[in-house]
Swiss-Prot record:
Entry's EC annotation: 6.3.2.9
Entry keywords, A to Z: ATP-binding, Cell cycle, Cell division, Cell shape, Cell wall biogenesis/degradation, Cytoplasm, Ligase, Nucleotide-binding, Peptidoglycan synthesis
Family the UniProt entry places it in: Belongs to the MurCDEF family.
Protein's recorded name: UDP-N-acetylmuramoylalanine--D-glutamate ligase
Any single biological process term in GO: cell division
Binding residues for ATP: 126-132
Length: 434
């Protein structure tokens, strides 16, 4: 039986707390700290952060929250006891601004964790598969009859749950490396680490720091807790001296009837199931939940089949490693749409996979030179200024049995606000094909 978890200190009435970033998690953290009697300063480097949200700004000021917009200055952090950075803000940017001997820098999730009433937590991290696995775990727990909160890095911040006053039986939380880096006492009853491949190296100084952040998920666990890890992490985990009971999962495939494509989803399913077993979820209920589970948008999402050609939206594919996973999910010829703001990675390492599985590549937007340099001579490639002509080009010459797959292997920020917008555009384009 796991012992009651030790939590970090809570803010004291009258102490100063600085929240950096006026996004959803920052607003939730500011409200929680305000509720606890702190003097709250809400900072955002974007001078237009509340443009069109004037009523919200007025509401926050009514609560006593001070809002300061524009470049951050050291005096904004004076006398701070807590500093809660935006999940997307590298902690290194606070150097020279925060007196770390006086102020504690902590993630919004760490802050909210300190105000929970001992609800058990199932937390999921990894370079890829986090959202699907967290959603699967929530579905399995729900099938068993639990009242479940699903949130964290997916949807609702944990601070919003704390403020709501609701009480769930189990909290299922997706958590990123950004959040984990400033978690000090956060401790899930069951923690899942699916995989680690190069990502977010514009945020973390190197791969070692990124890996260290991911393994912080387990640092406060004890022998009564559970650590579920992808089989590929077995040797790496040995370096970290995990105290929790460990289970390693592979793509062997326990369940039948899943609508999720790809061997990587067998890993996601097994990881969710192993974590849910700790809460008494039966294999039968897990299987029922999985049979009803619909693929999440933009993750190897079947859009439509037109005259025997399958169109698949994998806009969430933003890295080279996730492109590899996407290509391995199909045993039929793939006509690949990719391109965008390249984040780095070894595209040349996919040469054999591209040569054997991809019949044509349509590049769009930025980053074309990376793909052309890595795959020149392996497969016919064309470049298009935007997504629509790229999709239409591949669709026009596709044969029955082909897959037209959008798996960009890049971020979307050259042409779109986010990967969701890019995926929606792909679905719009495909929906108009005839």
């Amino acid at each position: 039986m796991a012992l009651e978890k030790t939590r970090g200190r809570r803010i004291s009435v009258g102490e100063t707390a600085v929240v950096v970033g006026a996004g959803r998690s920052g607003l939730a953290a500011a409200r929680l700290l305000c509720r606890e009697g702190a003097q709250v300063r809400l900072l955002d480097s974007n001078a237009d952060a509340f443009s069109g949200r004037e009523a919200l700004a007025g509401e926050l000021r009514q609560l006593g929250i001070s809002i300061e917009l524009g470049p951050h200055k050291p005096d904004q952090f004076e006398n701070a006891a807590f500093v809660v950075p935006s999940p997307g803000m590298p902690v290194a940017r606070l150097a020279g601004l925060v007196d770390e001997e006086r102020a504690e820098i902590l993630a919004e999730m760490e802050l909210a964790w300190r105000y929970l009433e001992n609800e058990p937590v199932l937390a999921v991290t990894g370079t890829s598969g986090k959202t699907t696995t967290a959603s699967l775990a929530a579905a399995m727990l729900h099938e068993q009859g639990y009242a479940v909160f699903l949130g964290g890095n997916i949807g609702t911040p944990l601070s919003e749950y704390v403020l709501s006053g609701h009480k769930a039986d189990v909290l299922v939380l997706e958590i990123s490396s950004f959040q984990l880096q400033t978690c000090s006492t956060f401790c899930p009853r069951a923690g899942i680490l699916l995989n680690i491949t190069p990502n977010h190296l514009d945020y973390h100084k190197d791969m070692a720091e990124y890996t260290e952040a991911k393994f912080r998920l387990f640092r406060c666990q004890d022998e009564g807790d559970l650590a579920v890890l992808g089989e590929s992490l077995r040797s790496l985990a040995a370096r970290y001296g995990l105290k929790a009971r460990q289970v390693y999962v592979s793509d062997a495939g326990r369940f039948s009837g899943s609508s999720l494509m790809g061997a990587h989803n067998r890993v996601n399913e097994e990881a969710a199931w192993q974590a849910c077993r700790l809460f008494g979820v039966s294999e039968e209920n897990a299987a029922r939940a999985l049979a009803r589970f619909a693929p999440l948008p933009h993750r190897l999402e079947r859009v439509r089949e037109l005259e025997g050609v399958l169109f698949v939206n994998d806009s969430k594919c933003t890295t080279v490693s996730s492109l590899k996973v996407a290509l391995e999910a199909f045993d039929r010829p793939v006509r690949l749409v990719c391109g965008g703001k390249f984040k780095g990675g070894d595209l040349a390492g996919l040469a054999d996979l591209v040569k054997n599985r991809v019949s044509a590549v349509a590049l769009f937007g930025a980053g074309r030179e990376h793909f052309e340099r890595a795959w020149q001579g392996l497969v016919p490639m064309t470049w298009h200024a935007s997504l629509e002509p790229a999709v239409k080009h591949l669709a026009a010459s596709a044969c029955r049995g082909d897959v037209v797959l959008m798996a960009p292997a890049t971020s979307s920020f050259d042409l779109y606000a986010n990967y969701e917008e890019r995926g929606k555009d792909f679905k719009r384009i495909v929906g108009k094909l005839s």
